[in-house]
């Protein structure tokens, strides 16, 4: 009988591991950060504390090394009393370097060198651990709020048990978002950008959505899109997925993709599915007018 639910949280410094640990604590986990690896087995020697445990482990641990951590994962996986999950909070090297340069912090593996050298060294060190993760989350384009919301869908046992859906709009000129399961190209729809009265608005405005909906191709497209997604969601849930991410792209990420993402998100919510909506380019545009210190990353 499994008595302990244990989540090991690791990943490169600056990726958002501390944010993840704090989020798990808010969900009711008993959190222990930077515990030496050799002490971890002692946690399961006594009686269960009755709630799940989250352990934060990274290169700052006194006895940390990838081989020892993998051996610990193997040992805990084989223990019939333990339900183990490994969460790896990841981030691209370029974004990690940007975060270090922005905060002017020294990297723990390169205190006397550039952040880039420390980041590269740590990514190489953690590579064997990364492939053992049960959950991999890339925070390169996430805010702390985004990360907490994603973890809540994965680990909060008090949250809805149905598959959660996220829809997001984006601009193809700025690249396809990371971690999207399905992408739909909305550039075939007529573009409100060329209507002077609509150009400065975005797809959340009724006038923009009405203009896009007036395209003869919109109604059959949206009907088929909605039916396809509603057909797929139960199948994805049966396969054990907890989350499905849908991306909608157009040229500028302001009108067509935003409108379609909004309309589909509303349709899925009306059908009873938990839905979150994000509009990447609109967020970037809003962030550009804020002071630099408010642009916090995970």
UniProtKB/Swiss-Prot annotation:
SUPFAM superfamilies: P-loop containing nucleoside triphosphate hydrolases (SSF52540). GO terms for molecular function: ATP binding; GTP binding. GTP binds at residues 58-61. ATP binds at residues 11-18. Disulfide bonds: none annotated. Keywords: ATP-binding, GTP-binding, Nucleotide-binding. InterPro entries: P-loop_NTPase (IPR027417), RapZ-like (IPR005337), RapZ-like_N (IPR053930), RapZ_C (IPR053931). Displays ATPase and GTPase activities. Belongs to the RapZ-like family. This is Nucleotide-binding protein RSKD131_3085. It comes from Cereibacter sphaeroides (strain KD131 / KCTC 12085).
